[in-house]
Swiss-Prot record:
PANTHER family: CHLORINASE MJ1651. (R)-S-adenosyl-L-methionine binds at residues 187, 231, 239. Changing residue 72 to A: Loss of activity. Keywords: Hydrolase, S-adenosyl-L-methionine. InterPro entries: SAM_HAT_C (IPR046470), SAM_HAT_N (IPR046469), SAM_OH_AdoTrfase (IPR002747), SAM_OH_AdoTrfase_C_sf (IPR023227), SAM_OH_AdoTrfase_N_sf (IPR023228). Optimum pH is 8. This is (R)-S-adenosyl-L-methionine hydrolase. It comes from Salinispora arenicola (strain CNS-205).
Amino acid sequence: MASTPWISFTTDYGLADGFVAACHGVLARLAPTARVIDVTHLVPPGDVRRGAAVLAQTVPYLPAAVHVAVVDPGVGTARRAIALTAGNGLLVGPDNGLLLDAATALGGVDAAVELTNPDWLGARMSATFHGRDVFAPVAARLALGAPLADAGPAVEPGALVRLPTPLVQPETDGFTAEVLTVDHFGNVQLAATGALLESLPRSLRVAHRPAVHARTFDDAPPGGLLVHVDSAGLVAVAVNGGRAADLLAVTPGDQLRVTAG
């Protein structure tokens, strides 16, 4: 890592409690020269898919770093704690699919280990707070240049847990795609890439509602439904001045059909 290392930090811990601060404290004590970028701590509780999407869509724009992510409904169970290298980054977190989309965005998994070395872990080991006691201590050591192999035994990249592939179904007059995420503004991001939208006309229908094929929000009238390619290169459905998720009554995992109108 760089002489002044970077660590990014993504969780579902929220900001009402001291969980984030405790992890920051561990990082500061063990790696006082590291700079920490808080990606978000407002991932919906236990929503691994949302955490994976946020992380994967953010890491390409961060400096070379150790990326710590904790959305871990299986904490304390037999699920593995892992660290892996991918491109110019390292990722640390639970083996529940959270890290692998980000690893792909960085160029793919080069090597992975299970975090079992007790010398790398916190002196106090809580069964329910591995962010503080496992992932933060490991991230700090990696940020300071400790070898990944010293953290624990190697894991075959193909044996890592992966999230199910979201549905994307091209059709003659459009496509059906799974809702990947809903952001703070109520915009509905689909798993479909922007290429599926290119050949469709300006007049569209989304779940039988009229919409426009747009480049910006203002291409639709106020309150109008629009479909565009978002900043991650994926198809998104939005409302100019409103919340598409509320209008369409959809949540992540639902399916939406986008067709020529």
